[in-house]
A protein has these predicted regions:
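ABC ATPase nucleotide-binding domains
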Residues: 205-222
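H-loop/switch region of ABC-family ATPase nucleotide-binding domains
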Residues: 173-174
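ABC ATPase NBD coupling module
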Residues: 60-74, 79
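Conserved ABC ATPase "signature" region
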Residues: 98-109, 114
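Helix-to-loop junction immediately C-terminal to a conserved catalytic motif
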Residues: 45
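Catalytic Walker B motif of ABC-type/P-loop ATPase nucleotide-binding domains
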Residues: 137-140
Length: 222
């Protein structure tokens, strides 16, 4: 396995989470608000302390120095707030690596990021996360504030970044249909725990209060 994590816990937020991810795999994390998706990404990235073991290609990525870390993993936070008066191209360059195609950023590269729309800022931050071509992408709601077309384009881009590569991605996402469409595996989180794998079974109704009827998610009525 490329990534192996065990016993990850953050006080009050994450309880004894363990998972493995293979090279080339895109794993989506789904769950209600506050279920622990962001906390799991934090634990893997070494944000906020906590306990547990993480091994990425034989090393603990949380112990890497600032020069080594971007090649091992990058973390995209859910927040798109960017107070720094940097040009978009300079912010992307801070991530290291080269440019990223497929995000249509040419028109905004010479604009300050604090003047961009939320969707544009999101695409700039995604470009920064992808630029160093890390082994592991930790992406928290990467499709947030993007229009439906861009949501599709972005998830397809992430898939193409992993294709045939010794790289992997964990993506926290609220859209269950998108998770089913693009993920190799889906981990369902609830109350700070990895509660189940996949979206087939009674746990979906219990955790989300929805069920699939004629191919569409609908509230449970019975």
């Amino acid at each position: 396995m490329m990534l192996s994590a065990s016993g990850l816990s953050l006080p009050g937020r994450l309880v004894d989470a363990s998972l493995e991810v293979a090279p080339g795999e895109l794993v989506c994390l789904v769950g209600p608000n506050g279920s622990g998706k962001t906390s799991l990404l934090h634990a893997l990235a070494g944000i906020g302390g906590g306990t547990g073991h993480v091994v990425l290609d034989g090393v603990d990525p949380r112990r890497l120095g600032p020069m080594e870390r971007p090649r091992a993993f990058t973390y995209l936070p859910a927040s798109r707030d960017l107070p720094w008066p940097l040009l978009a191209r300079d912010l992307i360059a801070l991530g290291g690596g080269g440019g990223v195609e497929g995000l249509d950023l040419e028109a905004v590269l010479d604009r300050r990021v604090d003047t961009l729309s939320t969707g544009e800022r999101g695409r700039v931050l995604i470009a920064r996360a992808l630029a160093p071509r890390p082994k592991l992408l930790l992406l928290d709601e990467p499709t947030a504030n993007l229009d439906p077309l861009w949501q599709i384009r972005l998830m397809a881009l992430i898939r193409s970044e992993l294709a045939g590569q010794a790289r992997a991605a964990l993506v926290a996402i609220h859209d269950l249909d998108a998770a089913q469409r693009y993920a190799d595996r889906i981990l369902v989180m609830d109350k700070g725990r990895i509660a189940a794998e996949g979206l087939d079974g009674p746990h979906v109704a219990q955790i989300f209060g929805i069920e699939k009827v004629d191919g569409r998610w609908q509230p449970v009525t019975r």
